[in-house]
Curated annotation (Swiss-Prot):
Keyword Hydrolase among record annotations: yes
Domain of life: Bacteria
Enzyme Commission number: 3.5.1.2
Subunit record text: Homotetramer.
UniProtKB keywords: Hydrolase
Protein name in the entry: Glutaminase
Length: 304
C-alpha cells in the first residue's frame, strides 16, 4: 500500500497544473463543477483504502460507467453475443463519431466509445427488467456504499442534449445492430453516466479489475480470464484518443470520464481513482493523468 504521505505528495505535485485544462461544458450540470477540486484514492487487494485531497467529494463518473455496464453484460451474456455486436479495437475517431459507425456498418469499434456503450446498454435493456436499478445495485455492492446514486439533474441535462447519441443509436438501428426503443435505452445510458461517486467509492468498486475478478468482499464478479481481457481493452481503448499517450506516461489499464475522473489498475496489487475536473484536448483529466504518471513513477509500476 502506498503511504498516505505519497498520495499527498502526488496531489501537491500536480496542483500547479490546475487552471491549464477546461471543464466539460456541453451540459450545464457539468460546467458548474468547481475546477479547483483534486483528489486521489487507492484500494489494495487486501481491501485497504487510502486517499488524499478531495477524494471524498462525489462527482459525475460519466464514461467510467462504461466499465460497469460492460462488466454487467459479461455476467448476463455469452461472450460471442457481445463481441458479435461490438468490436475490441481502438477507435482513432472522436468518442461520439457517426462517421465510423457508418463506415463499419453499424458495429462500434469498442465498448468504451459512445456507440459501443449504447450497444451494451441495449443488451442490458433487453435482458434486465430494471436495468437502472440493477446498475445501482451493482455499484453500491462493489463500492460498499449504499448512498451511491444517480444525479437526476445530470441525467436530465444529458437527455436534453442527446441529439448526437440518438443519431448514433438510430444509425446502428438502420444496420440492425440496435434492438430496443432508442429513447428508453438513451435514458438508461444517461443514468449510468450520471452515477455520482467519489474517488474512494470508485477505487473500491474497481478493485475486481486488480483482483482477478473478485470484488472487495471476495465475491467473484467475472472470471480471471475475463478480467485480464477487460484490462487489455482498457489499456488500448479506455482513454478516448489519448490511450497511447496514457500508456506511455502511466503504463496502466485505465478509463476516463469527462467528469474529470480516471480509474486505473495495477493488476494483482491495487486500483486507483483520481479526479480533477479540468480536461485536456482528448477529454481526459489533465491533472488526473499527471497524478497517475507521478504515482506510477514513484511506485515503479507499469504493466509494460
Amino acid at each position: 500500500m502506498p503511504e498516505l504521505a505519497l498520495l499527498e505528495e502526488v496531489v501537491e505535485k500536480v496542483r500547479p497544473l490546475l487552471g491549464q485544462g477546461k471543464v466539460a461544458d456541453y451540459i450545464p450540470a457539468l460546467a458548474s463543477v468547481d475546477a479547483g477540486k483534486i483528489g486521489i484514492a487507492v484500494t489494495t487487494v487486501d481491501g485497504e483504502t487510502l486517499g488524499a485531497g478531495d477524494y471524498l467529494e462525489p462527482f459525475s463518473i460519466q464514461s467510467i460507467s462504461k466499465v460497469f455496464s460492460l462488466t454487467l453484460a459479461l455476467t448476463l451474456y455469452e461472450e460471442a453475443e457481445i463481441w458479435s455486436r461490438v468490436g475490441k479495437e481502438p477507435s482513432g475517431h472522436s468518442f461520439n463519431s457517426l462517421v465510423q459507425v457508418e463506415l463499419e456498418r453499424g458495429k462500434p469499434r469498442n465498448p468504451f466509445i459512445n456507440a459501443g456503450a449504447l450497444v451494451i446498454a441495449d443488451l442490458l435493456q433487453s435482458r434486465l427488467g430494471a436495468p437502472k436499478h440493477r446498475m445501482l445495485e451493482l455499484v453500491r455492492q462493489l463500492s460498499q456504499n449504499d448512498k451511491v446514486c444517480f444525479d437526476k439533474q445530470v441525467a436530465d441535462s444529458e437527455y436534453q442534449h442527446s441529439a448526437r447519441n440518438a443519431a448514433i443509436a438510430y444509425l446502428m438501428k438502420s444496420f440492425g445492430n440496435f434492438q430496443g426503443d432508442v429513447d428508453t435505452v438513451l435514458r438508461t445510458y444517461f443514468h449510468y453516466c450520471a452515477l455520482k461517486m467519489n474517488c474512494a467509492d470508485l477505487s473500491k468498486a474497481m478493485l475486481y479489475l486488480a483482483n482477478r475478478g473478485k470484488s472487495i468482499t471476495g465475491t467473484e464478479l467475472i472470471s480471471q480470464v475475463q478480467t485480464r481481457q477487460l484490462n487489455a481493452l482498457l489499456a488500448t481503448s479506455g482513454l478516448y484518443d489519448g490511450a497511447g499517450e496514457f500508456a506511455y506516461r502511466v503504463g496502466m489499464p485505465g478509463k476516463s470520464g469527462v467528469g474529470g475522473g480516471i480509474i486505473a489498475v495495477i493488476p494483482g496489487e491495487l486500483s486507483i481513482c483520481v479526479w480533477s475536473p479540468e480536461l485536456d484536448g482528448n477529454g481526459n483529466s489533465l491533472a488526473g493523468t499527471a497524478m497517475l504518471e507521478h504515482l506510477s513513477q514513484r511506485l515503479g509500476r507499469s504493466i509494460f
